[in-house]
């Protein structure tokens, strides 16, 4: 197992997606805190800025035409042409109210976009406040091909990563605050029903994705924190009080590099935990994951770099 860190020219390379056609085939895209969208060559030797969203790009996907679908925490759902750099705002509101924390997406074979809005109360700058207060205002949303946006699931504990099963018979959304991945059935006898793909995860899931191997890959951004768990279950007054103390005194995510993969039955297939001895740069807080042809690409909300694990 070889772990390689590839620097990019800005902080917070939060998610990754692998290009599949033309000049983008095999290249890895990521978005950074300064609004940049970067293309990284497959071997990591070249990094080019291809666009600027004017916001804070988080989750990345590819649409049916090979354009990037970008969840921008500030601007909502965007489409980006990687050849021209053109940025199109697709959706920024739900039921007449602006989104404040568009986070991650998955694109279906018919062009439907499933995506998450982590909170209706706090934006990305105050994600820790939402997490500790356990507001449960996260939502799974659906953008239909006619441009309409619908709420599919609400009252989620920090809705995060989104992925479709290989047969598209269900859609998943990571519930970071509950350490679960929620599954919503789309076809068959269970259509419309909701259950859990996996639960009691060893830490807090962030982005998820379906790999080229058909598995649902799940990031573990930080290990389970007993203090955070207690705070989330405590009185609302206490939870609010904690978010008002100086940031240096608040609970901090523990450093780790860990991703898991589950099959459609919710069986754990891979649990990849990179030891410190293989991570001399201290890369941490993996928030994006993409398995492609046996390589596992990663992004991080905190790092000015992406990483790849050759297994």
Which role does the model predict for each range below?
Residues 1-311:
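Sequence-structural signature of mature extracellular/luminal beta-sheet repeat domains
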């Amino acid at each position: 197992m070889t772990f390689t860190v590839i620097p990019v020219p800005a902080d917070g390379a939060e998610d990754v997606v692998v290009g599949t056609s033309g000049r983008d085939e095999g290249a890895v895209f990521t978005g950074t805190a300064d609004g940049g969208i970067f293309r990284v060559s497959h071997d990591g030797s070249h990094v080019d800025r291809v666009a600027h969203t004017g916001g804070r790009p988080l989750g990345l996907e590819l649409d049916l035409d090979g354009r990037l679908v970008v969840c921008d925490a500030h601007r909502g759902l965007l489409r980006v042409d990687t050849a021209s750099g053109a940025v199109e705002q697709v959706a920024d509101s739900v039921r007449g109210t602006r989104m404040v924390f568009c986070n991650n997406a998955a694109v279906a074979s018919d062009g439907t976009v499933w995506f998450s809005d982590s909170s209706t109360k706090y934006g990305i700058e105050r994600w820790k406040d939402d997490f500790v207060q356990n507001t449960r205002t996260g939502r799974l949303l659906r953008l239909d091909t006619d441009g309409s946006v619908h709420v599919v699931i609400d009252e989620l504990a920090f809705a995060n990563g989104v992925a479709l099963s290989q047969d598209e018979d269900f859609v998943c959304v990571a519930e970071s605050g509950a350490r679960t991945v929620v599954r919503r059935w789309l076809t068959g006898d269970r259509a419309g029903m909701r259950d859990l793909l996996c639960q009691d995860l060893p830490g807090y899931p962030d982005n998820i994705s379906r790999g080229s191997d058909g598995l649902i890959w799940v990031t573990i951004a930080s290990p389970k924190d007993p203090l955070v768990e207690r705070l989330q279950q405590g009185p609302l007054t206490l939870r609010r009080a904690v978010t008002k103390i100086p940031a240096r005194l608040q609970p901090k995510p523990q450093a780790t590099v860990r991703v898991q993969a589950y099959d459609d039955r919710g069986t754990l297939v891979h649990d990849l935990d990179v030891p410190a001895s293989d991570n001399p740069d201290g890369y941490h807080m993996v928030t994006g994951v993409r398995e492609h042809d046996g390589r596992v690409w990663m992004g991080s909300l905190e790092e000015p770099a992406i990483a790849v694990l050759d297994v």
